[in-house]
């Protein structure tokens, strides 16, 4: 008798990568403007995301993408790209709930208390508490492993809770302690039911784990094309 095999369907869990790309190019060797160069590069990035990512077990290779960007046009001399990881989670409204947002990649934390005064390396889109929509709250971290909740008052971070959860920098895990979220602010100017959490990785090479799939966030990735000063001045 042959034992039957029951397939297990695993839901994909997407981690988005928000890139900040700067391209230096030689204006004397092309008829393209800076905007046209960045448009070409954006197509390269989109093609890379579609061909090399968006499936299981396909890592993001930072150096490979930079090589593709540099090869987009012969006038491009070099490029740099920062990487921020992002995940969405859907809060259970008006019910005390805790949440685990697992990036499965180590977070950047070069020393205890890193960047605490400016919000650490964790950020989020907005949400509401106590059914009050006149005050928007956000998450950040203190660089020592505490997740914080704050609002902006005259542009200054004002903290409601300095211990709203934990940040595990080594394992890339954000844990939100029991919280009653009553509403969600817009995400990218669009009405949303989800909150986006972002984190700066320790390495720009990102590896998916288990059911994790990587993709580039083409909406929030930014491009800056600049004429290389050396080629334009000869100095």
What are these regions (language model features)?
Residues 143-145, 152-235:
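Surface-exposed interaction regions enriched in Ser/Thr/Asp/Glu
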Residues 10-18, 58-67, 84-91:
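A glycine-rich phosphate-binding loop feature that marks nucleotide/adenosyl-phosphate handling sites
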Residues 1-52, 56:
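Carbohydrate-recognition loop of C-type lectin domains
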Residues 114-160:
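Structural flexibility/helix-modulation signal
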Residues 21-27, 103-105, 199-201:
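Flexible glycine-/small-residue-rich
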Residues 72-87:
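Short, well-structured beta-strand/strand-turn elements
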């Amino acid at each position: 008798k042959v034992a039957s095999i029951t397939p297990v369907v695993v839901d994909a869990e997407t981690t988005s990568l928000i890139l900040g790309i700067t391209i230096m190019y030689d204006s004397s060797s092309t008829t393209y403007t800076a905007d046209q160069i960045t448009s070409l590069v954006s197509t390269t990035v989109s093609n890379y995301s579609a061909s090399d990512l968006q499936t299981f077990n396909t890592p993001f290779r930072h150096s490979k993408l930079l090589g593709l960007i540099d090869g987009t046009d012969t006038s491009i001399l070099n490029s740099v790209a920062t990487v921020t990881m992002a995940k969405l989670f859907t809060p259970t409204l008006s019910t005390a709930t805790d949440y685990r947002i697992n990036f499965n990649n180590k977070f950047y934390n070069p020393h205890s208390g890193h960047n605490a005064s400016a919000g650490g390396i964790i950020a989020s889109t907005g949400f509401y508490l106590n059914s009050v929509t006149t005050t928007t709250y956000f998450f950040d971290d203190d660089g020592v492993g505490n997740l914080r909740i704050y609002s902006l008052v005259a542009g200054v971070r004002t903290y409601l809770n300095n211990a709203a959860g934990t940040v595990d920098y080594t394992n890339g895990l954000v844990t939100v302690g029991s919280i009653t979220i009553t509403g969600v602010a817009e995400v990218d100017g669009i009405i949303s039911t989800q909150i986006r959490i972002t984190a700066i990785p320790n390495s720009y090479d990102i590896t998916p784990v288990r059911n994790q799939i990587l993709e580039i966030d083409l909406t929030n990735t930014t491009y800056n094309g600049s004429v290389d000063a050396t080629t334009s001045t000869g100095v």
